[in-house]
Amino acid sequence: MPAGRWTATRRTWRSRRRRLVFIVLSVLILPYALIGLYLLEFIHPVSTLMLRDLVLLRGYDRQWVEFDDIAPVLVQSVMMSEDGQFCAHAGIDWAQMRGVVEDALDGEQTRGASTIPMQTVKNLFLWNGRSFVRKAMELPLAIAADFAWSKRRLMEIYLNVAEWGEGIYGIEAAARHHFGVSAAKLSRRQAALLAVSLPNPIDRTAGKPGRGLRRLAAVIERRAGRSGGYITCLYD
């Protein structure tokens, strides 16, 4: 290959490599910039699943609702079901995480350790499915979100982007779809059913619960009724 042509080829590869590095860095940095942007309470974030539905021309149902317009029994139920230490940790429940790692090293089936901040950043910026790459991105993002946002703002965003059925996002759309009421009017049992459906909202239908889901909801309803000491960061 002539020297001039070889030099041109090298320049082309360097240019492509620089572009690739720029794209990768942009993808990694963008979520942190958005975390800062979402400090502004008039901005209503959307999740990656909502964006997917838009790209696929499916559409979705999401009606943003402010934290104070969500029934406290729903907040209590979600905390007791998904992240009982939400007010105590700084984005990651390290005790739970350590237990998961120990179970994995022992070859045992691992239990969930995703906190509400972790689930929120996953919904906003990442993708579903188990992946070490996703988890490595999720952990620092959860810490950043918990540091930047108030606990009330974090919970508000989480409850407005969580999936509660095919094309159903956010607690207002979920409450109206499954029970025909607003998020402010949910009963204790309805709130518990919505909370326990969160891990698998496609297969677990809050509005038409099976026996197993009703049993889980009864447990969460009892825990929510005793959750006063766990929710001090959200209610005065």
Swiss-Prot record:
SUPFAM superfamilies reported for this sequence: Lysozyme-like
Keyword check for Transmembrane helix: yes
Keyword Glycoprotein: no
Origin species: Rhizobium meliloti (strain 1021)
Main enzyme class: transferase
Subcellular location: Cell inner membrane
Pfam families tied to this protein: Transgly
InterPro entries: Glyco_trans_51, Lysozyme-like_dom_sf, PBP_transglycosylase, Pep_trsgly
Gene name linked to the record: mtgA
Keyword list, A-Z: Cell inner membrane, Cell membrane, Cell shape, Cell wall biogenesis/degradation, Glycosyltransferase, Membrane, Peptidoglycan synthesis, Transferase, Transmembrane, Transmembrane helix
Pathway noted in the entry: Cell wall biogenesis; peptidoglycan biosynthesis
Protein name: Biosynthetic peptidoglycan transglycosylase
One term of GO molecular function: pentosyltransferase activity
Membrane topology: Single-pass membrane protein
